[in-house]
Amino acid sequence: MSLVLAVYGKGGIGKSTTSANISAALALKGAKVLQIGCDPKHDSTFPITGKLQKTVIEALEEVDFHHEELTAEDVIETGFAGIDGLEAGGPPAGSGCGGYVVGESVTLLQELGLYDKYDVILFDVLGDVVCGGFSAPLNYADYAIIIATNDFDSIFAANRLCMAIQQKSVRYKVKLAGIVANRVDYAKGGGTNMLDQFAEKVGTRLLAKVPYHELIRRSRFAGKTLFAMDDSEEGKEECLQPYLQIAEDLLSEAPMSSVPVPIGDREIFEIVGGWQ
């Protein structure tokens, strides 16, 4: 039985880069991993495969949406450390629903019988709007992970995600494994003070703190995971540690997790100092 993870976060905060590096850390610890990109940008698996692969929606269009005509090879690419990647894709701009495409991808995975092939299945999901389709991975996940930065917009989105996880937990097994604080700029005096407060209020923890580092950004544009960058790169070992920490935690016998209790908007403003 696969360990199923659903990674969510506000767009543009490094969610997919973080997901790819978590997948890499899990694979290097011996797990057979499938990463599924659930974002219309369809670039989640780029650091793993080194290319923009064909999406599920593109493959379905080629067979007039007859799921039974597709095989795993039509939609899956293998990349770094033997990680398999799949991209849901999205409809043309101005038409259709991105969430629907995510739901179709989940259906295809079931029909292809892929859930039993992997040790870990990681969904990398757009977290700005958690509608029915984009929340579908929570129906199958053992654990959700929220990627966030230490700012209002990110925390606001994280709170909405906590609402979705709480609601899904009533019918499904999903729990929140924690929040990954991303782009923590220690060099410029940055920290996680607001995220620390938020995590405590909703009843979760900071799973790891990923530093802001140019090497992480460069690895993304190079189409590589951080683990695939040259060992001589300055700061590589420091940057790897949070991802290895996350992988070790998730592969443990009983990772710490909880059902979050979202807070009101006023409390979020109080955390960031906007309202008293």
Swiss-Prot record:
Biological or metabolic pathway of the protein: Porphyrin-containing compound metabolism; bacteriochlorophyll biosynthesis (light-independent)
Matches recorded under InterPro entries: NifH/chlL_CS (IPR030655), NifH/frxC (IPR000392), P-loop_NTPase (IPR027417), Protochlorophyllide_ATP-bd (IPR005971)
Record text on cofactor binding: Binds 1 [4Fe-4S] cluster per dimer.
Binding-site residues, ATP: G12, I13, G14, K15, S16, T17, K41, N182, R183
EC number: 1.3.7.7
Keyword Iron-sulfur found: yes
Reaction(s) catalysed by this chain's protein: chlorophyllide a + oxidized 2[4Fe-4S]-[ferredoxin] + 2 ADP + 2 phosphate = protochlorophyllide a + reduced 2[4Fe-4S]-[ferredoxin] + 2 ATP + 2 H2O
BP GO annotations: light-independent bacteriochlorophyll biosynthetic process; photosynthesis, dark reaction
Entries under SUPFAM superfamilies matching the protein: P-loop containing nucleoside triphosphate hydrolases
GO molecular function, a single term: oxidoreductase activity, acting on the CH-CH group of donors, iron-sulfur protein as acceptor
Positions that bind [4Fe-4S] cluster: C97, C131
Keyword entries, A-Z: 4Fe-4S, ATP-binding, Bacteriochlorophyll biosynthesis, Chlorophyll biosynthesis, Iron, Iron-sulfur, Magnesium, Metal-binding, Nucleotide-binding, Oxidoreductase, Photosynthesis
Top-level lineage group: Bacteria
Family listed: Belongs to the NifH/BchL/ChlL family.
Function: Component of the dark-operative protochlorophyllide reductase (DPOR) that uses Mg-ATP and reduced ferredoxin to reduce ring D of protochlorophyllide (Pchlide) to form chlorophyllide a (Chlide). This reaction is light-independent. The L component serves as a unique electron donor to the NB-component of the complex, and binds Mg-ATP.
This protein's name: Light-independent protochlorophyllide reductase iron-sulfur ATP-binding protein
Organism in which the protein naturally occurs: Chlorobium luteolum (strain DSM 273 / BCRC 81028 / 2530) (Pelodictyon luteolum)
Lineage: Bacteria, Pseudomonadati, Chlorobiota, Chlorobiia, Chlorobiales
Gene giving rise to this polypeptide: bchL
